[in-house]
Amino acid sequence: MEKKPFLTEAMAQEIIQDVPTPFHVYDEKGIRENARRINKAFSWNKGFKEYFAVKALPNPVILQILKEEGCGVDCSSLTELMLSEVCGFSGSDIMFSSNQTPVEDMKKAYELDAYINLDDATMVEFLERVAGVPENIFCRYNPGGTFSLGESEEGFQVMDKPGDAKYGMTEEQMIESYKKLAAKGAKNFGIHAFLASNTISDEYYPELAGILFQLAVRVQKATGVHIGYINLSGGVGIPYRSEQTENDIMAIGEGVRKKFEEILVPAGMGDVAIFTEMGRFTTGPYGALVATAIHEKHIYKEYIGLDACAANLMRPAMYGAYHHITVLGKENEPCDHMYDVVGGLCENNDKFAIDRMLPKIDIGDIVYIHDTGAHGSAMGYNYNGKLRSAEVLLCEDGTHRLIRRAETPRDYFATLDFLPLMKPLFED
């Protein structure tokens, strides 16, 4: 898939006049169109809903855009629930999936009448004790072992290892949990599972759906409860590399439909609503980190230093993740220079790219780092006293809007109990 920026150099320079680099910028048009594609792909299911993972991009402007497109939200903490509430989400618009859940978080989810997804069998009594048992309840499934998509030309395709994951229940634990929940007043039950991350395959969701649909049939027979919802969670990925193929959401939706009709309909369970939580797929490609080249260094390697660092985009440092880079204004120039593109943290893993072939980069060039619309700004941090960058929305009409200002030193010091001692630093 060819990686094309949604900003031109001229557009970036216009934004920079108002918002200095570094900043994350999001494409409203792209996000809206993608949300509509998702809804269309699963329109065959009357109860379908996409629950956008708030952790991927926790900005109220983005959440409100997705709400307008018919999406709900997937929350995992008290603050995500609070953010979603002020954006107008409540009740069945919220999926609450948490683990090792604090009392305050569970109480808030119950107060909002969210769909609560229990991660562990012991959470049944915990939920009843701290909040109460709602009519609608989910349990998270962990099948153990290794999850794969079978054989390919490259060999056995291992996608992930659920058996090593801390999440979810065994089938036996789920069955006992549903029985207990039913006895305590729950009436409608859901199944949730997340078995692999960032899959670049149209087969992942259909394969997962087949597993969960068969599980639903077994659980309903074993317990007599009504399985009304199945949440395929996230895991549908995006092509971070240009040589990767983009997932076809229409093909994915059709694959899930076929499994639905093969397994659930014959079992008399054709009323089951399908939910998804595609945070990365929904917004990932429609965000970018825009930075300026401020230094170059020539020692054993060639380095380009940016005014952004891993505090603005953690994924390359934390996971060794690849993010494509475009030098705005030089899209058509030959990539004949090898660089390490780095930030200024006192950590040697603060590298956006290693041995990357790029056009010649000059001081002052605008560097566009692709695919930061999910798990980008959201994973920002303050190590080394670095400050989180601004967030900008590129509106559908071509204008831009600041939707989160950059942090300031005052923000950094705000929670310290000696702030009065810092007052002279902030006086004009």
Task: Please place each PLM-identified region on the residue numbering.
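A charged N-terminal "starter" segment
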Residues: 1-115, 121-135, 183-187, 221, ...
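Hydrophobic, small-residue-rich alpha-helical packing segments that form membrane-like cores
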Residues: 104, 117-119, 123-148, 159-163, ...
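Conserved, mostly hydrophobic/aromatic
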Residues: 31, 55, 77, 109, ...
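Active-site-proximal loop/turn and secondary-structure-junction residues that shape catalytic pockets
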Residues: 56-58, 79, 100-102, 120-122, ...
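Structured core elements
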Residues: 72, 95, 115-117, 138-140, ...
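Charged (often Lys/Glu-rich) extended helix/loop segments that serve as interaction or gating elements
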Residues: 261, 265, 269-428
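Generic secondary-structure signature for well-ordered alpha-helical cores
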Residues: 21, 36, 40-44, 132, ...
